[in-house]
Amino acid sequence: MNPKRSFQALILTLHNYWADKGCAVLQPYDMEVGAGTFHPATTLRALGPKPWKAAYVQPSRRPSDGRYGENPNRLQHYYQYQVILKPNPSNLQELYLGSLKAIGLDPLLHDVRFVEDDWESPTLGAWGLGWECWCDGMEVSQFTYFQQVCGIECSPVAGELTYGLERLAMYVQGVDNVYDLNFNGREGEEKISYGDVFLQAEQEYSRHNFEFADTSMLHRHFIDAEKECLALLAAGAPGDNDNQRLHKCVFPAYDQCIKASHIFNLLNARGVISVTERERYIARVRDLAKACGEAFLLTDAGGLNWNRAA
């Protein structure tokens, strides 16, 4: 399949490229997240000493970015391609440029530039040194060296690559409207466009995000998710008689943190959160993320026993 002819071929090409580089090609996380970084394969696995390589597509939702399907390049639901490499390889930029070449953007034939743009996620308590990648004057992706995640220092530093798949596909296919993207690589009656797949959903979710979402219920759900996250962390905490001192309920707790984050984004889209309240909500989600990150370090995946074995 030609990555210049279909959205799905672009994804498959990136899958094959990063699989050849040793990454575990994972599936999207089955929850509403604001970015690929929220996937536990990045947020949690970036912590601790254990090496980790993964790549995946992540459907991402940013309710406030909806435009009822009327904007050609702004969406409330879109796709990111995420790569996480820990420890970050010395040739990360070279690997990234190789991936561009694989999808048909030869750096020798295009004006590829890296523009310094440090990255931050306040709700995840995460930040890193980063660069946007611009190709012929348009941003197509970003790479970041994580310094902190969940308010915890990353040691070793992990390298993260994030591709905006719709924007990248629009560039390689040469179209100006995201809904005109060829999705399946066929032409004529067999052609399926991005709009065929997603336009109606984009229109309906814009109505939901801006007009219909029940704000009273969302406020209650936020509190419920916050309480459940903390309760699960407390229930799974290692006891005094646990010889391994392992935490036993990190991932279910982190799911509740993700839920709280998405609910906050919906409340923000509905316009019912003041500037002061917004900062408080962000701090509450960040506290949950920090607690989940600290608990993850008390697990095998977080490197507790791996450290001991070393």
Swiss-Prot record:
Pfam families: tRNA-synt_2e (PF02091). One of its GO terms (biological process) is glycyl-tRNA aminoacylation. Its main location: cytoplasm. Keywords: Aminoacyl-tRNA synthetase, ATP-binding, Cytoplasm, Ligase, Nucleotide-binding, Protein biosynthesis. CDD domains: GlyRS_alpha_core (cd00733). It catalyses: tRNA(Gly) + glycine + ATP = glycyl-tRNA(Gly) + AMP + diphosphate. The keyword Cell wall biogenesis/degradation does not apply. It comes from the Bacteria. The keyword DNA-binding does not apply. GO terms for cellular component: cytosol. One of its GO terms (molecular function) is ATP binding. Its EC number is 6.1.1.14. SUPFAM superfamilies: Class II aaRS and biotin synthetases. It is found in: Cytoplasm. InterPro entries: aa-tRNA-synth_II/BPL/LPL, Gly-tRNA-synth_heterodimer, Gly-tRNA_ligase_asu. Tetramer of two alpha and two beta subunits. Belongs to the class-II aminoacyl-tRNA synthetase family. PANTHER family: GLYCINE--TRNA LIGASE, CHLOROPLASTIC_MITOCHONDRIAL 2 (PTHR30075:SF2), GLYCYL-TRNA SYNTHETASE (PTHR30075). This is Glycine--tRNA ligase alpha subunit. It comes from Agrobacterium fabrum (strain C58 / ATCC 33970).
